[in-house]
């Protein structure tokens, strides 16, 4: 009987350079395939390294989780500064649809975001949202309330998209009407 020798530490060889970005990219790919954040052990197995090597780049599992989710959220639509003044409604729609697309691509992401204690991923969306609303010159409280309302709506909509049957009645484009009403309310704030 032979015993398989366990690989420890960082991978050896020119073709297998381990770094934080490689870990994040692999974790995001696994998350897309498995609909949940992969365990450290599964991630290490996929990377063909010992699990402890991941802790060289991330202090703990929560730091890795924050890095993964923040990296995913950073991929959503970034409002175009030059077009916000005249087309803030369109920019808000593009931001919202991009966020829903991300949540649909990574089905376990919504639950992960809502259960996290870190606010880094939410901060990314919040900054982009506030940039879109700059032309309205809203009060700080109104911006916070508008953000809370939109985030709750988008999270509920993403949940509905993930829970619908094989013949979908909802799609991402279906938010256009409700978003127009939302924008009208913001203009009259």
How would you label these PLM feature ranges?
Residues 22, 26-63, 67:
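Helix-turn-helix
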Residues 124-167, 186-189:
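Hydrophobic alpha-helical bundle segments that form small-molecule/ligand-binding pockets
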Residues 69, 97-127, 159-163:
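Amphipathic alpha-helical segments used for helix-helix packing
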Residues 78-108, 150:
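Hydrophobic alpha-helical connector segments
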């Amino acid at each position: 009987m032979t015993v398989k020798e366990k690989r420890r530490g960082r991978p050896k060889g020119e073709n297998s350079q381990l770094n934080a970005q490689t870990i994040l990219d692999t974790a995001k790919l696994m998350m897309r395939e498995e609909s949940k954040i992969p365990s450290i052990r599964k991630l290490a197995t996929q990377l063909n390294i010992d699990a402890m090597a991941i802790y060289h780049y991330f202090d703990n599992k929560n730091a890795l989780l924050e890095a993964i989710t923040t990296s995913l959220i950073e991929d959503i639509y970034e409002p175009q500064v030059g077009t916000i003044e005249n087309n803030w409604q369109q920019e808000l729609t593009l931001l919202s649809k991009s966020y829903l697309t991300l949540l649909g691509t990574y089905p376990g992401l919504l639950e992960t975001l809502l259960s996290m204690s870190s606010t880094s991923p939410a901060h990314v969306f919040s900054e982009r949202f506030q940039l879109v609303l700059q032309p309205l010159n809203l009060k700080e409280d109104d911006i916070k309330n508008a953000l809370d309302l939109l985030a709750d709506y988008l999270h509920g909509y993403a949940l509905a998209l993930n829970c619908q049957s094989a013949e979908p009645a909802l799609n991402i484009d279906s938010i256009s009407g409700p978003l127009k009403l939302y924008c009208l309310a913001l203009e009259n704030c």
